[in-house]
UniProtKB/Swiss-Prot annotation:
GO terms for molecular function: GDP-Man:Man3GlcNAc2-PP-Dol alpha-1,2-mannosyltransferase activity. It comes from Neurospora crassa (strain ATCC 24698 / 74-OR23-1A / CBS 708.71 / DSM 1257 / FGSC 987). Residues 185-205, 455-475 dip into the membrane without crossing it. Pathway: Protein modification; protein glycosylation. It catalyses: an alpha-D-Man-(1->3)-[alpha-D-Man-(1->6)]-beta-D-Man-(1->4)-beta-D-GlcNAc-(1->4)-alpha-D-GlcNAc-diphospho-di-trans,poly-cis-dolichol + 2 GDP-alpha-D-mannose = an alpha-D-Man-(1->2)-alpha-D-Man-(1->2)-alpha-D-Man-(1->3)-[alpha-D-Man-(1->6)]-beta-D-Man-(1->4)-beta-D-GlcNAc-(1->4)-alpha-D-GlcNAc-diphospho-di-trans,poly-cis-dolichol + 2 GDP + 2 H(+). InterPro entries: ALG11 (IPR038013), ALG11_N (IPR031814), Glyco_trans_1 (IPR001296). The chain crosses the membrane at residues 8-28. This is GDP-Man:Man(3)GlcNAc(2)-PP-Dol alpha-1,2-mannosyltransferase. It comes from the Eukaryota. It is found in: Endoplasmic reticulum membrane. CDD domains: GT4_ALG11-like. Belongs to the glycosyltransferase group 1 family. Glycosyltransferase 4 subfamily. It is a single-pass membrane protein. Residues 29-184, 206-454, 476-556 are cytoplasmic.
Length: 556
């Protein structure tokens, strides 16, 4: 009897199994398409309203420009209608007449950091390439108006946008992605929160192209689940989780002494953390595999994203909603204010005479910035008693966000006292931009102590100002920024305090520092806003091309 029942169940499973394998993906797609259809129906009214508002604002804007004179109108037209079509990987050129809606998922758009510079530079490049396109930013900054945000963009980044085609939709669920909301299982919690926030965004408007510029891979995967005909693009500043993070948990690994979680993979709690991170990394890989166009800010980030997302992206039909991707993961360096620094900071034989033996470290006082390592290295450098060390000074410039940062500054001051170098180290907290520029003019060396800095905008700023860099031998500063130019060095790399001390000695003892400064400034030209715009357009054109192919198809 038992054997017969077992045989019956086995035969049933053997027969039904293949059907289930076909049926489950079908149901999965059906659920996603149904939810997507519901969201489209729900937001059609707002879509029409946005198009009407853009048209009305465009008329008002043209009228105001006409009132100011033909010259102002011509300058504005030249500013936003001068980017040529560059074509896509399929050999076709998609002209400027594309007039769809590009949704930028950036819940903290008014923060004013490097990530926000990328967002606004991307929107400006998009406006110049497709003047008829509408750029919609999903943000959680309820306390500021469109006018206030755009004014801050001009003041903070000197980026001038075309106001009529920029709109903001305000999210009410941003708290779900705050680390403070998830004191435990923070990575998983914030990723789950991004799904809630993405639903909030799509409940406001379904865009024609969906772009994430903050690193919410789960939101992009959710978009693909709901709208299979909406191309997605990701600009990845850093992977949410990386292989280096996983390896750093093991004290015996090559990176077991680096990072804020170094060596924490031991014991029952440590092993549980490692399993949790490994499971999360697999989910993260699945989400990233669904993205049509992936851009990273550096070679380091590209390598880690390829390692995590690449294997699944190359599969065909292995996961519902994921198909083979022909678009390679591209490096698009973030825009840095190189031109502004070139104008503000002189690099010449005359200015060389005004440089001081100052080691300048510009960074927020966060634990990963590793200020302690730099202070210890500077103390070792002074102990050498070399000619370069006699009048050297270390200047730490950075912002203090909260009480935790204040405590770190206090501990650094204690360390400086313990090392008896108080009179050789200066702290400048929350310095203004003019003050920072003045230090960039005076200093000789720029320092960066962070392990695996994903890119390193501050290091590019050092180079643009003509400083000789001594940076951590990892991440973007090593692979992309402080590299040779014309076969000659632009700076030095280090890992330990001893190596940093040696790097300080080399940087301050160069026989011809002016030549190195010129090479450093030449190196920085690779990271201009113009170069970013060119690469950004090249990648976003792929999304427009996908949309052009999908357009004849009926909406799902």
């Amino acid at each position: 009897m038992a054997n017969g029942l077992f045989t019956y169940v086995a035969i049933s499973l053997f027969t039904i199994g293949p059907l289930l394998a076909l049926f489950i993906p079908f149901v999965w797609r059906l659920v996603g398409s149904s939810l997507g259809w519901y969201l489209r129906r729900k937001t059609d009214g707002r879509r029409c309203h946005i198009l009407e508002v853009v048209e009305a604002d465009e008329r008002k804007y043209r009228d105001s420009k006409s009132a100011k004179g033909r010259k102002a109108e011509k300058e504005d037209r030249d500013t936003f209608n001068n980017t040529e079509a560059t074509g896509t990987s399929d050999g076709k050129v998609y002209d400027k007449d594309w007039d769809g809606i590009v949704g930028f998922f950036h819940p903290f758009c008014n923060a004013g950091g490097g990530g926000e510079r990328v967002l606004w530079a991307a929107i400006r490049a998009t406006q110049k390439r497709w003047p008829k396109a509408k750029c919609v930013v999903y943000t959680g900054d309820h306390d500021v108006s469109k006018e206030a945000i755009l004014s801050r963009v001009e003041q903070r980044f000197n980026i001038h946008l075309h106001p009529p085609t920029v709109n903001f939709l305000y999210l009410s669920t941003r708290r779900w992605v705050l680390a403070s909301t998830w004191p435990y299982f923070t990575l998983a919690g914030q990723s789950f929160g991004s799904l809630i926030m993405a639903w909030d965004a799509f409940s406001l408007l379904v865009p024609d192209i969906f772009v994430d510029t903050m690193g919410y891979a789960f939101a992009l995967g959710f978009s693909r689940f709901l709208f299979r005909d909406v191309p997605t693009a990701a600009y990845v500043h850093y992977p949410t989780i990386s292989t280096d993070m996983l390896e750093s948990l093991d004290p015996a690994s090559a990176v077991g002494s680096q990072g804020v979680n170094a060596g924490k993979g031991t014991g029952a709690k440590g092993r549980a953390k490692k399993i949790y991170w490994q499971l999360f990394a697999r989910l993260y890989s699945l989400m990233g595999a669904s993205v049509d166009v992936v851009m990273t800010n550096s070679t380091w980030t590209q390598a880690h994203i390829e390692k995590l997302w690449g294997p699944v992206r190359n599969l065909t039909g292995a996961v519902p909603g994921i198909k083979s991707k022909v678009n390679p993961i591209a490096v698009v360096y973030p825009p840095v204010a190189v031109e502004e620094l070139e104008q503000e900071v002189e690099v010449s034989p005359e200015s060389e005479k005004r440089r001081e033996n100052v080691l300048l470290y510009i960074a927020q006082f966060r634990p990963e910035k590793n200020h302690q390592l730099i202070v210890q290295a500077f103390a070792e450098f002074l102990k050498s008693g070399s000619e370069a060390a006699r009048d050297a000074k270390l200047v730490l410039v950075g912002s203090v966000r909260d009480d935790y940062d204040s405590k770190r500054v206090y501990k650094l001051r204690l360390l400086v006292n313990e090392l008896h170098i108080k009179d050789r180290v200066e702290f400048h907290l929350d310095a203004s931009w003019p003050d920072i520029l003045e230090w960039l003019r005076r200093a000789s060396v720029g320092v960066n102590g962070m392990w695996n800095e994903h890119f390193g905008i501050g290091v590019v700023e050092y180079q643009a100002a003509g400083l000789i860099s001594v940076v951590h031998d990892s991440g973007g500063p090593k692979l992309d920024i402080v590299v040779e130019v014309d076969g000659e060095p632009t700076g030095f790399h280090a890992t330990t305090s001893k190596e940093f001390a040696e790097g300080f000695e080399k940087a301050l003892s160069l026989p011809n520092p002016y030549a190195v400064r010129l090479r450093a400034r030449k190196s920085a030209k690779r990271f201009t806003e113009e170069e970013f715009a060119r690469r950004w357009i090249e990648q976003l054109e792929k999304c427009v091309a996908i949309k052009a192919v999908e357009k004849p198809k009926s909406r799902q």
